[in-house]
């Protein structure tokens, strides 16, 4: 163990000063003095001019600080430094490695579900029609159908709340959740009889919608000119679709440009 040299009387009176507003180390500070220990016998340190500078301006001074500096200097005595050139930054880095002990950094991984975002969820109230002008209507409180409406029957058109949720990052697609407003019925995609199927699920309004929805409720919205497509996040390449026939259920289809209609127009609802 390295022997700590006895501090001079000048240094001890300095360390036990009553001025608590002094700074401990200040490289270019005023009224600084040098303290050179007589037993630093390493010629490389002396030749390169490594010295301890102590300022009269201290903060949080203690004997522990003094001892730490002396121990560091004792360690420096054991460091072999080349004397052929002035001290470089890399040499100082190696000196630090000898003085200080490296400790591992422990990174803690947190579950995103454990955190709740305080920011309100962005949403829009809207109505949809397919490109053949069929409106989406709630039928028997459990099924969504597409049919042409006119006159007073226009009021039957379902009003959706489209919430912008978390999903796969894609610059061309926006993840959303679709809920029939006032009914808390969410469009979801599940596997039934070996085929992706669109259904309505009633959810607790105190919990839903939320930023991180279950994947079956998420649709990737794509805007093409003035029309929209809604692709299932759970089943890629499957889209919310309507039939060309009248009053048929809205379904999940994987055919674009054929008998299935996958393009919709949106109208904001007040």
From Swiss-Prot:
Domain of life: Eukaryota
Subcellular location: Cytoplasm, Cytosol; Secreted; Lysosome; Secreted, Extracellular exosome
UniProt key word Cytoplasm: yes
Recorded coiled-coil stretches: none
GO molecular function per UniProt: cytokine activity; integrin binding; interleukin-1 receptor binding
GO biological process: cellular response to lipopolysaccharide; cytokine-mediated signaling pathway; fever generation; immune response; positive regulation of cell division; positive regulation of immature T cell proliferation in thymus; positive regulation of T-helper 1 cell cytokine production; positive regulation of type II interferon production
Signal peptide: none
Keywords: Cytokine, Cytoplasm, Inflammatory response, Lysosome, Mitogen, Pyrogen, Secreted
Family annotation (InterPro entries): IL-1_CS, IL-1_fam, IL-1_propep, IL1/FGF
Propeptide residue range(s): 1-118
Classification via Pfam families: IL1, IL1_propep
Gene Ontology cellular-component terms listed: cytosol; extracellular space; lysosome
PANTHER family: INTERLEUKIN-1 BETA (PTHR10078:SF30), INTERLEUKIN-1 FAMILY MEMBER (PTHR10078)
Leftover remarks: IL1B production occurs in 2 steps, each being controlled by different stimuli. First, inflammatory signals, such as LPS, stimulate the synthesis and promote the accumulation of cytosolic stores of pro-IL1B (priming). Then additional signals are required for inflammasome assembly, leading to CASP1 activation, pro-IL1B processing and eventually secretion of the active cytokine. IL1B processing and secretion are temporarily associated.
Subunit field text: Monomer. In its precursor form, weakly interacts with full-length MEFV; the mature cytokine does not interact at all. Interacts with integrins ITGAV:ITGBV and ITGA5:ITGB1; integrin-binding is required for IL1B signaling. Interacts with cargo receptor TMED10; the interaction is direct and is required for the secretion of IL1B mature form. Interacts with HSP90AB1; the interaction facilitates cargo translocation into the ERGIC. Interacts with HSP90B1; the interaction facilitates cargo translocation into the ERGIC.
Protein family per UniProt: Belongs to the IL-1 family.
Function summary: Potent pro-inflammatory cytokine. Initially discovered as the major endogenous pyrogen, induces prostaglandin synthesis, neutrophil influx and activation, T-cell activation and cytokine production, B-cell activation and antibody production, and fibroblast proliferation and collagen production. Promotes Th17 differentiation of T-cells. Synergizes with IL12/interleukin-12 to induce IFNG synthesis from T-helper 1 (Th1) cells. Plays a role in angiogenesis by inducing VEGF production synergistically with TNF and IL6.
Name the record gives this protein: Interleukin-1 beta
Organism: Eumetopias jubatus
């Amino acid at each position: 163990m390295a022997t700590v040299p006895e501090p001079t009387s000048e240094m001890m009176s300095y360390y036990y000063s009553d001025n608590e507003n002094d700074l401990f180390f200040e490289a270019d500070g005023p009224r600084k003095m040098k303290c050179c220990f007589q037993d630093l016998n390493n010629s490389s340190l002396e030749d390169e001019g490594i010295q301890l500078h102590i300022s009269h301006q201290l903060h949080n001074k203690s004997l522990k600080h003094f001892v730490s500096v002396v121990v560091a200097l004792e360690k420096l005595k054991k460091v072999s430094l080349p004397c052929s050139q002035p001290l470089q930054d890399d040499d100082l880095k190696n000196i630090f490695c000898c003085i200080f002990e490296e400790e591992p950094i422990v990174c803690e991984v947190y579950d995103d579900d454990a955190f709740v975002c305080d920011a309100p969820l962005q949403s829009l109230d809207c109505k949809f029609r397919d490109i053949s002008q069929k409106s989406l209507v709630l039928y028997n409180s459990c099924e969504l159908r597409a049919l042409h409406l006119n006159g007073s029957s226009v009021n039957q058109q379902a009003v959706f709340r489209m919430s912008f949720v978390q999903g796969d990052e894609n610059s061309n697609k926006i993840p959303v959740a679709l809920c029939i407003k006032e009914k808390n019925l969410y469009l979801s995609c599940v596997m039934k009889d070996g085929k992706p199927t669109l259904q309505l699920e009633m959810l607790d309004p105190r919990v839903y919608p939320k930023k991180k929805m279950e994947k079956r409720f998420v649709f990737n919205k794509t805007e093409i000119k003035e029309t929209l497509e809604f692709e299932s996040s759970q089943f890629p390449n499957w889209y919310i679709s309507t039939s060309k026939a009248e009053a048929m259920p809205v379904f999940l289809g994987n055919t674009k440009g054929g008998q299935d209609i996958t393009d919709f127009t949106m109208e904001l609802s007040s």
